[in-house]
Every structure is written in structure tokens, then in C-alpha cells.
Amino acid sequence: MGPRARPALLLLMLLQTAVLQGRLLRSHSLHYLFMGASEQDLGLSLFEALGYVDDQLFVFYDHESRRVEPRTPWVSSRISSQMWLQLSQSLKGWDHMFTVDFWTIMENHNHSKESHTLQVILGCEMQEDNSTEGYWKYGYDGQDHLEFCPDTLDWRAAEPRAWPTKLEWERHKIRARQNRAYLERDCPAQLQQLLELGRGVLDQQVPPLVKVTHHVTSSVTTLRCRALNYYPQNITMKWLKDKQPMDAKEFEPKDVLPNGDGTYQGWITLAVPPGEEQRYTCQVEHPGLDQPLIVIWEPSPSGTLVIGVISGIAVFVVILFIGILFIILRKRQGSRGAMGHYVLAERE
């Protein structure tokens, strides 16, 4: 995997870890993704920022233009000039902080000539009971690097080479307290403002359409449970065997992808013994559903019809072949009989 792919891969992993943890209860989140490259030959700017409320991109900032751009209609049309000014100033401040942190990490690694990348994800999540949880993580050159611990005001090193930076940052207690204040106070306050701003959009609930499909190969029979076109994206999917929940280790983990229209799709798969498909059911829980939805695989009527048509055609072809063969044999027998009478008549 080349260096261009590593930052994107790390961001996806961090995002799944910190934000995409499917929970049945409706939660809301605000998080920012920062990324940059020390040299622009990696296809990245020196600093780019993406802001997400829940799972919707609402703001973008780029170091080169130093412009803050709204990315959703409800932000463009509803945000006040004062709130937009505060958001713009904070992103420009993050730009400066990111650059300082980037050079600190590079110096602690004795990296100066080569191109390197830095990724940061920070934000907060709010549950229905208004409890909040913050996160602040750094990735360097496509690898997890440092994570801030607001309870203890220190940093957790994800790899040995992160220790010099960890020790340096832990000497700055003022910064640690500022980080905690952001995660526990400023981030939840901004999230509340954005939720109010996005009322009617962010609080909608679209239940999933659930289907179970059947796939057969030479040696494996696989059931796939798909949940389609739902919002929000937190969803619980599991397999039941004889109406009893199965251990998650027995089937492949859930995959979730955006559809591009604001909704999501997710699926889980399970290998089953041939002929035992009816023993397994898929259970789906989602905030848009009043109760868990249980779906079983049902053979497609069209599939049965196709098999019947193919069988009928095969029988017809066999009968037609036998009929043609019978006619040919009778003609040959008739020809031989006529030849025999002609020869006898000639001898007389």
C-alpha cells in the first residue's frame, strides 16, 4: 500500500472507531478531521479540515485558500453571521495548531527531508441522556500515534516512537486543560447549536428495508442480510439460529457504507450448511423501527419458475429428439422394404 492511500485508510479506521460505533439509542456527534502533508507531492494540502455533525459533512477549510466553506444547505441558509465568524476563527486557529504539532512530531522523529503526513480526529458524542464523551487522536504516516486522555490529562502513545512527543506535551499542563475544556464544554455546546440549526434534517429517522439473500457456490452456502436506505447510520444487525442469538464471532462483522443521498446501507453474512437455511434469521434494530425486525430467507418464486421452465424445455427437447429419431428409423425401414420387392420382381 503506497503512501497516498495510508492517510485515507487511517482516517477511515479512526472514524469507525470513534464515531461509527452502532448504538441503538440515538446519539449525536460532532467531529473534525484534520489532515496535511509536509510536502505537497503526496496530493495533500499543508492542512485541510472537514467538519461533521452526526455523519454529515457541514464545513470545509483549506490552508491554501484560508477559506471556510459550508457544505450543507441547512448550514448555508440558517447559520448566523456571528456563529459563522466563530467557526471560521476556530478553524484558522486549528490550522496554526496543526502546523506546530506537525513540526514537533517530525522533529522528535528526526524527520526533515522526506514527505510525511499527519492526521487528527477530535470531537464529542452526546447520548440521549445528555452525557458526553470526547476523543482526540493523532495519526502519523498512516499509523495510530497519540491519543489524549481527558480524565488524566495525559497522552497515550500508540507506538514507541510517539514517546518523545508524549513526554513533551505532558509538560504543558495548560494545553492539556484547554484540550479537556474543549472536549467537555466547547464541543458539546457547539454540537447543541448545530443540532438546533439542523432541526428537521439531523433528527429525521428513516427505517431500513431489510432483505436476506442466498448465494451458493460449489462448497459453501452463504446468507447475506442487507439493510438498505436507512438514517441515522447507527444500527444493530445479528443472526439468530433457531430463534437464539448467535455469537458475533460466528459471522462476518457488519459493514456500513453511505449511499450518497444521506442514507446508509449495511450488511452481515453467514456461511450455513446446505439445506439448513430456514433455521437462520436476521434481526435488525434501528431508531426508525418501533421494534426489532426479523427477516428470513425465502426462495424466490421467480427462481422456482425459471427452474420449472428449464425442466419443461429439457423434457420437450428429449421428446422431440425421440420423435425425430422414430420418424427417421421408420423411413429407413420403409426404404429397405421397397428395395426388397423390386429385386424379387426383377428375378421373376
From Swiss-Prot:
GO terms for cellular component: apical part of cell; basal part of cell; cytoplasmic vesicle; early endosome; external side of plasma membrane; extracellular space; HFE-transferrin receptor complex; nucleoplasm. Belongs to the MHC class I family. Changing residue 282 to Y: In HFE1; probable risk factor for porphyria cutanea tarda; correlated with increased serum transferrin levels; higher frequency in patients with type 2 diabetes than in controls. Pfam families: C1-set (PF07654), MHC_I (PF00129). Keywords: Cell membrane, Disease variant, Disulfide bond, Glycoprotein, Ion transport, Iron, Iron transport, Membrane, Signal, Transmembrane, Transmembrane helix, Transport. PANTHER family: HEREDITARY HEMOCHROMATOSIS PROTEIN (PTHR16675:SF172), MHC CLASS I-RELATED (PTHR16675). SUPFAM superfamilies: Immunoglobulin, MHC antigen-recognition domain. Residues 23-306 are extracellular. Residues 206-297 are annotated as: Alpha-3. Residues 298-306 are annotated as: Connecting peptide. The lineage of its organism: Eukaryota, Metazoa, Chordata, Craniata, Vertebrata. One of its GO terms (biological process) is negative regulation of proteasomal ubiquitin-dependent protein catabolic process. It is linked to Hemochromatosis 1: A disorder of iron metabolism characterized by iron overload. Excess iron is deposited in a variety of organs leading to their failure, and resulting in serious illnesses including cirrhosis, hepatomas, diabetes, cardiomyopathy, arthritis, and hypogonadotropic hypogonadism. Severe effects of the disease usually do not appear until after decades of progressive iron loading. Residues 115-205 are annotated as: Alpha-2. This is Hereditary hemochromatosis protein. Residues 23-114 are annotated as: Alpha-1. The chain crosses the membrane at residues 307-330. Expressed in all tissues tested except brain. Residues 331-348 are cytoplasmic. The keyword Disulfide bond applies. It comes from Homo sapiens (Human). It is found in: Cell membrane.
